[in-house]
Every structure is written in structure tokens, then in C-alpha cells.
Regions:
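Active-site entrance/lid segments in N-terminal catalytic domains of soluble metabolic enzymes
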Residues: 1-169, 175-201
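Conserved small/polar residues in nucleotide/adenosyl-binding loops
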Residues: 203-208
């Protein structure tokens, strides 16, 4: 079976219906990015806002994005006779469980998990990034019954060992490899930001 991966091609029920009609074996919906939700909230915040107003704005944007994504799942399920796989990309542990529960309730056939965290701490412990994959998988498996698929990046030092541990802890499948947005640095604010990403030949891809 040919599975259509998460992209702009899978961000509407109409596009997904056409992909199913053309022979796709399954469809992975356009990923829901937690950091994108947070970025939009930050861009709309005003320094003059009270803390309560900023919190309300962030929660409003979060709920709006989640509602749109759940609607995409439901509408795609109505028009597609093939499996519809949701995809989430988060960087805080607290959000994974809430996202996963709502996605299962919306009717997704499976859930793809993307994990990305910039390791900038001086006291970083080797192996903690790999362990984070396992811990998040365990937490999600305790709360939902649909298959959980782990999507891995290409910068792991020992992907075979990690994949073995993911299967041992209940992963239904593993996707190789994810191409994350490349981080950049705002030299004026000295902050991490997401870099631009364009279609280029494989030889021009940058490594993290």
C-alpha cells in the first residue's frame, strides 16, 4: 500500500477524497504543530496586555486550531474509505495526552507522533532525548486504544536500539525519517526561531 504522508496535500477533506479515489492505501493528515499554536499566540500578544488576557488569547487560539483539526479528521472520515491517520507535533509533555484523546474521539484510525526538542541545556544527559520518545509513547498508550506510530528524525545516534524499545513499549509502527523545520536564531532577540524550509535536492539538505 502507498501511504500519503503528512503535507499540504492532506490538509482538506476534498484533497483526501481525491487521493483515496486515486488509490492511496492510507492518508496521514497535515500535522498539528503545538509550537505553531504558541507562535501565533505570541505574535498577537501586546506588551500592554494583562497576564490574564495573554493566557486567554493563547487558550483561544489553541482551542480554535484544535477544533479545525478535529473537523478535518471527521470530514475526511466521512468521504474516505481508507484509514485516516492523524499527526501531531508537540514539544511539551503536558499537551500530548489531551491532543491524543481528542483525536481518538474524533475518529482517527491511528495517531502519528512527531517529537522534536532543541537540546540547548548545558546539563543535558546523554540518552534523555531517546528516553523521551519512550516515555511519551507509554503515556499515550495508557490513554488511547488506536495504533500509535512514532516518526523519527535522522539525527539519532542509534535508531535501531530506539526502534526496538519503541516496539517493546507498544508502538504499532515507526516512520523513517522525519524532516523537521530547521531552527534558526534571531540575533537581535537571541531567541530560537523556526527557519524557512524550501524544496531542494537531497544533497542540499542541512543537518541539525
Amino acid at each position: 500500500p502507498i501511504i500519503i504522508s503528512s503535507s499540504g496535500l492532506t490538509n482538506s477533506a476534498g484533497k483526501n477524497k481525491k487521493l483515496a479515489e486515486d488509490g492511496a492505501g492510507a492518508i496521514v493528515l497535515k500535522s498539528l504543530f503545538e509550537e505553531q499554536i504558541m507562535l501565533e499566540a505570541d505574535q498577537l500578544k501586546d506588551p500592554a496586555f494583562y497576564p490574564e488576557a495573554s493566557d486567554y488569547l493563547e487558550e483561544y487560539i489553541r482551542e480554535h486550531k484544535l477544533s479545525e483539526y478535529l473537523t478535518l479528521i471527521k470530514e475526511s472520515k466521512k468521504v474516505c474509505p481508507i484509514p485516516i491517520i492523524a499527526s501531531i507535533n508537540c514539544y511539551t509533555d503536558s499537551e500530548w495526552i489531551d491532543f491524543a484523546k481528542m483525536i481518538e474521539e474524533a475518529g482517527a484510525d491511528a495517531l502519528e507522533i512527531n517529537i522534536l526538542a532543541l537540546q540547548s541545556e548545558v546539563q543535558y544527559t546523554y540518552g534523555s532525548f531517546e528516553q523521551r520518545h519512550i516515555d511519551i509513547l507509554r503515556h499515550i498508550k495508557k490513554t488511547i486504544k488506536i495504533p500509535v506510530i512514532m516518526k523519527l528524525g535522522d539525527n539519532l545516534t542509534n535508531p535501531v536500539a530506539l526502534i526496538d524499545q519503541l516496539y517493546a513499549n507498544g508502538a504499532a509502527a515507526v516512520v523513517l525519517f522525519n524532516r523537521f523545520y530547521q531552527p534558526d536564531i534571531n540575533i537581535e532577540k537571541m531567541e530560537h526561531i523556526s527557519g524557512e524550509i524550501f524544496t531542494v535536492s537531497y544533497t542540499h539538505l542541512t543537518l541539525p
